[in-house]
């Protein structure tokens, strides 16, 4: 059993790490906490994988947005970032994201991955208003968003 505070700590450590690489972050986490039926090692690996992808493919000119909430016995964390133009066509095995999804399932959680390219029409994808402004930079080819749902006890 873990407190949601542990996830906040993982998020903060990863945000600090990418800040050293030149990224800016916009983090909004409520002060409400809950108890998770989760594994510390898996939670740490999940956020390490997500933020490693941001380091590899993210656009430093657009803030990385992290939001969380607690509703209906679920703790939700959403991480979104803009994708650099030069990485828009880069092929990837997505092994890190597949591992994140597998770990979330092992903890009875869920993951939703959403990618919107600059050529997509507005409203066709599950992208929040905050991430849509990421297209302001001409070096950005799209927005990548991962939503994680952790069950609460």
Segment roles from a protein language model:
Residues 61-73:
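Short beta-strand/loop element within the Bergerat-fold HATPase_c
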